[in-house]
Amino acid sequence: MEIKQIAVAGSLESSDMMITISPNDGQGIVLELDSNVEKQFGNHIRALIKTTLARLGVESATIEAVDKGALDCTIQARTIAAVHRAAGVEHYNWKEIDSWNA
């Protein structure tokens, strides 16, 4: 999926995450993470975001993630929403996304 514009999903409320995604002109994935639990869960959060991006077919993007204690399901949901908004996609393929949980 091609990232065409800047998009944001989520909030800075407790137990949430704000994901900002923008085009990166074919330079791969650049991920910046700001989290209160960086030392404990930073590697896991980064891996989860990168896995979600790969499943969506995103090969190039700049992602800024501000974590406020979000659970895995919230991190995935915010990443999916931000990618679809940034790509200009209006319809989700729910069957594909649901198959990730098999």
UniProtKB/Swiss-Prot annotation:
Q: Which domain of life is it from?
A: Bacteria
Q: Where in the cell is it found?
A: Cytoplasm
Mention any one GO cellular component term assigned to this protein in its UniProt record: cytoplasm
Where are residues bearing O-(phosphoribosyl dephospho-coenzyme A)serine located in the sequence? S14
What keywords tag this UniProt record? Cytoplasm, Phosphoprotein
**Assembly, per entry:** Oligomer with a subunit composition of (alpha,beta,gamma)6.
**Cited function:** Covalent carrier of the coenzyme of citrate lyase.
Q: Which NCBIfam families match?
A: citD, PRK13253.1
Family, as annotated: Belongs to the CitD family.
This chain belongs to which protein, by name?
Citrate lyase acyl carrier protein
Native organism:
Streptococcus equi subsp. zooepidemicus (strain MGCS10565)
Could you read off the lineage of the organism from its UniProt record?
Bacteria, Bacillati, Bacillota, Bacilli, Lactobacillales
